[in-house]
Amino acid sequence: MKQDMIVILDLGSHENTVLARAIRALGVYSEIYPHDITVEELKALPNVKGIIINGGLNNVIDGVAIDVNPSIYTMGIPVMAAGHDKATCAVKLPAFTDDIEAIKAAIKSFVFDTCQAEANWNMANFVNDQIELIRRQVGDKKVLLALSGGVDSSVVAALLLKAIGENLVCVHVNHGLMRKGESEDVVEVFSNQLKANLVYVDVTDRFLDKLAGVEDPEQKRKIIGGEFIRVFEEEARKLDGIDFLGQGTIYPDIVESGTKTAKMVKSHHNVGGLPEDLKFQLVEPLRQLFKDEVRACGLELGLPYEMVYRQPFPGPGLGVRCLGAITRDRLEAVRESDAILREEFQIAGLDKKVWQYFTVVPDFKSVGVRDNARSFDWPVIIRAVNTVDAMTATIEPVDWPILMKITDRILKEVKNVNRVCYDMSPKPNATIEWE
């Protein structure tokens, strides 16, 4: 089903994604394009009902003020100016105002009254459209997907499975740095329930041997990332007839790579680093979706709520939460204490309130008392933060009775631990993760 679209032209505003999300929340599809898109390129886009120019005229590139192609105003498509002073625009929206409701009302009026757009953007339509597109792109060929168990790769797997069934080959690499029960969940959901073609590779010893004695966080990340690519490459070479590589690229990955006007936040990468002789065509069915839409897509596809709303998890896994050189006893302490924290937050209803929460175990011990004797064991540090964009973060003021219950369980149930601390550091100055 072809949905109506509102195009946002980027003139250097930091609010592009906020604007796109606001329009999508109205049930109308929206995408961000560079300011110098041509009329021909705009005409080639499907069902464009309106254009929003977002940003001021004070932005420059190489000393030259930037603006949109003036021919856009003669296309016969309504144009709104958001913080852009053009008399030719149908509607003007102030760039800075405290009246959020007035802005929402103006956007809604432009989308529905001025542009006459139809609210036909929803997950059911998206899933059906993507299934059709995937089948058209892939045909009867096979797709290889690295299935980590995270939200993005899980939703991609479920969507590809709906589209091409047994022609999807998933590879799950258990590097020994997963959260408790995570690999088992992947096998249960995708292999046992959804009957996916799943290759499960347990390389725990291989990874932990490579990481032995490595203290530097960046070096740990490089070892984990590099070894993952090598394992994935080895498994890919064992498989015949693979022409496509599925990836969990989402819309913020594309936007954050930057346009000519917006500063690049980070270079986009996903399952990169494969040798050049493994030439796959990419299948990226989620590249249009924001993170909350990815979760909605997962629910639409029937994935378990717990999998779709899984906590954000760093690529190196628990490897950067077992601080310093990774040892098996401290890694187990991180895994067990993290499981207790997640269970108790779920019981208390905090799992739906707190953006991210986890435990870390540092590479030092403290003196304590256990069974009327001196102990010398590891501390566990709890971290729970709230954020909108992960650029800044505040600390969740967890009630004392909940913290005391979590502490009691960790001290009783986790081996080699005699102390529990709560990290009170906001971002800035501290980052969300410790390493």
From Swiss-Prot:
Domain of life: Bacteria
Gene3D superfamilies: 3.30.300.10, 3.40.50.880, HUPs (3.40.50.620)
GO molecular function, one term: ATP binding
Pathway of action: Purine metabolism; GMP biosynthesis; GMP from XMP (L-Gln route): step 1/1
Role this protein plays: Catalyzes the synthesis of GMP from XMP.
UniProt record, GO biological process: GMP biosynthetic process
Protein name, as recorded: Putative GMP synthase [glutamine-hydrolyzing] 2
SUPFAM superfamilies: Adenine nucleotide alpha hydrolases-like, Class I glutamine amidotransferase-like
Glutamine amidotransferase type-1 domain: residues covered: 1-120
GMPS ATP-PPase domain residues: 121-310
Pfam families membership: GATase, GMP_synt_C, NAD_synthase
Subunit composition and interactions: Homodimer.
Enzymatic reactions: XMP + L-glutamine + ATP + H2O = GMP + L-glutamate + AMP + diphosphate + 2 H(+)
